C-alpha cells in the first residue's frame, strides 16, 4: 500500500533555491528564466530555419530572418497575457472574479500553457498579417523551437516544487516539500521529457529530414498534436489542480479536456497541409 511506504523507498527533494540570484529587491527565479530561455531559443532557432532556404517551398522562406527580431516582443506579450488570462478563466475563475486585483499578480504564480498558446497564436496571426507573411508558415517557424522552452519551464516547475504528480510507490517517486507526507510522481520531469526533448526531436526530424516546412502548417500541426498527446498522457500521473479536482470519474482533468481539441486541431492542420501539397504537386 502506498500509505505504508517507508521514507527510503522514495527520493528526497533536491535542495535547489527557486531564486537564482537577487539584485536588491529584484529576485530572478528559475521559472521566469525558463520563459526567457524559451522565447530566445525559439527566436534563434526560427532565424536559423529562415536562413536555410532549402527547407522551404521553392527555396523561398516566408519572411526575412530579421522579422523575428520584431516578433520577440509580440511573442512575450502573447505568452504572458495569454498564459495569465487562460489560468484565470480555466483554472481559478471563481477566485479571481472575487479578487480581480489579484489577476495582475504574476509573481504569485498561475500560468496556463493552453492560454499561452492561444495568446501566442493571436500574436502570430496579427504580426503575420501586418507584415504580409503567410500565417501557416509563421506558425511553423515558431512552433519548431517551442518544445525546448516547454522543457525548461517544466524543469523550473520541478525546482519550484509545484504541479507535482499523484502519490506513487515507484522507486523514483519524490517527497515534495509542499506535497504532503507521501512521495509523488515527478510529473514535471515527465512533461519536460515528452513535451520538451521528445517533441523537439520529432519536429527536428520533420523539419530537417522530411522537409515538412515545404507544406505550410504541417509542423505546427505536429507540434499541437504532439503536445496534446503528451499532456494527456502525463495527466494520468499529475495531481489535478486542487481548486478543480477531477471533472469526471476520478480520472478526467481540466488539462485533458483542454488538450483534446489541440490534438484534433493539430491532426486537421496536418491533413490540410498534406492535401494542399497533393493538389499543388
Swiss-Prot record:
InterPro entries noted in UniProt: Lgt
The yes or no answer to whether the keyword Transferase is present is: yes
Q: For this protein, what is the EC number? A: 2.5.1.145
Task: From the UniProt record, give the pathway where this protein acts.
Answer: Protein modification; lipoprotein biosynthesis (diacylglyceryl transfer)
EC class of the enzyme, as a word: transferase
One biological-process term from Gene Ontology? lipoprotein biosynthetic process
Residues annotated for a 1,2-diacyl-sn-glycero-3-phospho-(1'-sn-glycerol) binding in this entry = 154
Q: Provide any one GO MF term from the record.
A: phosphatidylglycerol-prolipoprotein diacylglyceryl transferase activity
TM region positions: 23-43, 71-91, 107-127, 133-153, 189-209, 217-237, 247-267
Where does the protein principally reside? membrane
Q: Does Electron transport count among this protein's keywords?
A: no
Subcellular location field:
Cell inner membrane
Q: How does it sit in the membrane?
A: Multi-pass membrane protein
**Keywords recorded for this protein, A-Z:** Cell inner membrane, Cell membrane, Membrane, Transferase, Transmembrane, Transmembrane helix
Entry GO CC: plasma membrane
For this protein, the record's Pfam families field holds: LGT (PF01790)
Q: What does this protein do?
A: Catalyzes the transfer of the diacylglyceryl group from phosphatidylglycerol to the sulfhydryl group of the N-terminal cysteine of a prolipoprotein, the first step in the formation of mature lipoproteins.
Q: Which family does it belong to?
A: Belongs to the Lgt family.
**Stored PANTHER family:** PHOSPHATIDYLGLYCEROL--PROLIPOPROTEIN DIACYLGLYCERYL TRANSFERASE (PTHR30589:SF0), PROLIPOPROTEIN DIACYLGLYCERYL TRANSFERASE (PTHR30589)
HAMAP family to which the protein is assigned, alphabetical: Lgt
- How is this protein named in the record? Phosphatidylglycerol--prolipoprotein diacylglyceryl transferase
Gene name as annotated: lgt
Amino acid at each position: 500500500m502506498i500509505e505504508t511506504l517507508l521514507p527510503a523507498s522514495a527520493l528526497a527533494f533536491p535542495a535547489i533555491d527557486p531564486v537564482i540570484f537577487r539584485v536588491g529587491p529584484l529576485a530572478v527565479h528559475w521559472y521566469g528564466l525558463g520563459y526567457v530561455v524559451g522565447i530566445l531559443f525559439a527566436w534563434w532557432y526560427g532565424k536559423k530555419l529562415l536562413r536555410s532556404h532549402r527547407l522551404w517551398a521553392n527555396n523561398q522562406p516566408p519572411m526575412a530572418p530579421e522579422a523575428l527580431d520584431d516578433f520577440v516582443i509580440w511573442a512575450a506579450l502573447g505568452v504572458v497575457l495569454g498564459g495569465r488570462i487562460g489560468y484565470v478563466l480555466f483554472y481559478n475563475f471563481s477566485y479571481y472574479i472575487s479578487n480581480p486585483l489579484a489577476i495582475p499578480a504574476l509573481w504569485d504564480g498561475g500560468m496556463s500553457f493552453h492560454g499561452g498558446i492561444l495568446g501566442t497564436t493571436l500574436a502570430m496571426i496579427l504580426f503575420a498579417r501586418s507584415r504580409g507573411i503567410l500565417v501557416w508558415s509563421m506558425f511553423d517557424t515558431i512552433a519548431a523551437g517551442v518544445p525546448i522552452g516547454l522543457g525548461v519551464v517544466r524543469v523550473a516547475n520541478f525546482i519550484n516544487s509545484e504541479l507535482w504528480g499523484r502519490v506513487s510507490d515507484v522507486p523514483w517517486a519524490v517527497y515534495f516539500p509542499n506535497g504532503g507526507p507521501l512521495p509523488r510522481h515527478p510529473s514535471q520531469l515527465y512533461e519536460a521529457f515528452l513535451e520538451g526533448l521528445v517533441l523537439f526531436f520529432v519536429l527536428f526530424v520533420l523539419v530537417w529530414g522530411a522537409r515538412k516546412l515545404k507544406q505550410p502548417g504541417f509542423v505546427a500541426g505536429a507540434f499541437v498534436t504532439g503536445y496534446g498527446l503528451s499532456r494527456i498522457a502525463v495527466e494520468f500521473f499529475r495531481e489535478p489542480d486542487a481548486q478543480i479536482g477531477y471533472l469526471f470519474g476520478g480520472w478526467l482533468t481540466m488539462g485533458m479536456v483542454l488538450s483534446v481539441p489541440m490534438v484534433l486541431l493539430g491532426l486537421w492542420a496536418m491533413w490540410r497541409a498534406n492535401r494542399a501539397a497533393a493538389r499543388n504537386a
